[in-house]
Curated annotation (Swiss-Prot):
Domain notes: Avian ovomucoid consists of three homologous, tandem Kazal family inhibitory domains.
Compartmental location: Secreted
Keyword flag Signal: yes
Position of the signal peptide: 1-23
Disulfide-bonded cysteines: 28-67, 45-64, 53-85, 93-132, 110-129, 118-150, 159-189, 167-186, 175-207
Organism this protein belongs to: Dromaius novaehollandiae
GO molecular-function terms, A-Z: serine-type endopeptidase inhibitor activity
PANTHER family noted in UniProt: OVOINHIBITOR-RELATED, SERINE PROTEASE INHIBITOR
Highest classification ranks of the organism: Eukaryota, Metazoa, Chordata, Craniata, Vertebrata
Protein's name in the database: Ovomucoid
Glycosylation sites: 33, 76, 98, 196
Keywords: Disulfide bond, Glycoprotein, Protease inhibitor, Repeat, Secreted, Serine protease inhibitor, Signal
Domain Kazal-like: from-to ranges: 24-87, 88-152, 153-207
Pfam families: Kazal_1
Length: 207
């Protein structure tokens, strides 16, 4: 099997908005592996579509591709449940009273009541109203993953070998601290170097 074929197999990761973060371990030892040109272990995953939802809220095409993602990014994602991840929880921002800020823009009048929610950007908001306010002020469309604080990713991305002049087309998305989705590690690390290290990992998967 060529290296290109391996990259294609590893790129069959489908994404959706994150959900919950507890799951069961997947037995990755049953999948064959090989070594790529950089001397790194990669898994040879089948193209079988049997989607699972990872504990990071990302939908993987099958168990093997979740394992491949863990190896590639040094993550420890487990399986939350079989099937695709659920969509973000809808929120009704119209129920909050509005006021006009200094810029003449209408923004919700939010209380200081602490009732944290986790946004689809991986950021914890003190309450649902403040998530709505963030969307209006920043022009974003962040949804609510679930009630409660976001469960943090402890994995990091090693960008010491970057930048690189050309990145592959493999799709293993990462969400940067700038709320931008990067197609793969190479795209993300090139951006990290360009930002002089100010860009960090928000979470694995699409923003």
């Amino acid at each position: 099997m060529t290296m290109a074929s391996v990259l294609v197999l590893l790129s069959l990761v489908l994404c959706c908005f994150p959900d919950t973060a507890f799951g069961v371990e997947v037995d990755c030892s049953k999948y064959p592996n090989t070594t790529n040109e950089d001397g790194k272990e990669v898994l040879l995953c089948p193209k079988i579509l049997n989607p699972i939802c990872g504990s990071d809220g990302v939908t993987y095409s099958n168990d093997c591709l979740l394992c491949a993602y863990n190896i590639e990014y040094g993550a420890n994602v487990s399986k939350d449940h079989d099937g695709e991840c659920k969509e973000a929880v809808p929120i009704d921002c119209s129920k909050y009273a509005n006021a006009t800020n200094e810029e003449g823009k209408e923004v919700p009048l939010c209380t200081k009541i602490l009732s944290p929610v986790c946004g689809t950007d991986g950021v914890t908001y003190s309450n649902e109203c403040l998530l709505c306010a963030h969307n209006i002020e920043q022009g974003t469309s962040v949804g609510k993953k679930y009630d409660g604080e976001c469960k943090k990713e402890f994995a990091t991305v090693d960008c010491s070998d970057y930048p690189k002049p050309v990145c592959s087309l493999e799709y293993m998305p990462l969400c940067g601290s700038d709320s931008k989705t990067y197609n793969n590690k190479c795209d993300f690390c090139n951006a990290v170097v360009e930002s002089n290290g100010t860009l960090t990992l928000g979470h694995f998967g699409k923003c």
